């Protein structure tokens, strides 16, 4: 016999579904997050003039360099271009010794912090008559705002062969007729024999004066 009692049904879920967030509140939240990110970016410390110079020399001649580390070659160039090397108190040898002393044993580069340590070492030798702090400041002044000096620019070199080929006063034959005394080209007149159809004998100095004489006689 079938059970006449009805099975209890599950209570319907009366919890209302989550409504989508208020667009105005979402926009406000995104705006606040954006402002916070901008404030964080603005709060990032600016590079000092010394660190800017360090980065300029660090990337010099190396397209893959990041500017955060400096090779020994660029370190020597910085000391030379910024006149840290004076040839008396500080020499190229001194610069190389300090670099080897500061960098790690297995490293070939130095960081900005190590760079500052190296400058402190050189400052003692470069400005012996000043206190340690004053000497460091003087060395920093030599470097701040500086950039690598570009050298090895090709210059024009004069040679007898080049002079002979370019000096128009030494040209002969038909080539000589293509230039005037100042070396300026005559254009078409120097390349083509133009026919004189004026009726005057070549070399006649009074060409074109006949009409003036006739009018003057009237």
Curated annotation (Swiss-Prot):
Region Disordered: list its residue ranges.
1-45, 165-192
Q: What residue spans carry the region label Mediates interaction with LIMK1? A: 2-115
**So which residues have sugars stuck on them?**
151
Q: Name one GO cellular component term.
A: cytoplasm
Entry-annotated residues carrying Phosphoserine? 19, 31, 34, 106, 158-159
Q: In which tissues is it expressed?
A: Predominantly expressed in mature oligodendrocytes.
* Annotated Zn(2+) binding sites: 60, 71, 79, 82
- One of its Pfam families is p25-alpha
Going by the UniProt record, its keywords in alphabetical order are:
Cell cycle, Cell division, Cytoplasm, Cytoskeleton, Glycoprotein, Golgi apparatus, Hydrolase, Magnesium, Metal-binding, Mitosis, Nucleus, Phosphoprotein, Zinc
Q: Which Gene3D superfamilies match?
A: EF-hand (1.10.238.10)
Family classification: Belongs to the TPPP family.
Q: What is this protein called?
A: Tubulin polymerization-promoting protein
Phylogenetic lineage: Eukaryota, Metazoa, Chordata, Craniata, Vertebrata
**Gene name, please?**
Tppp
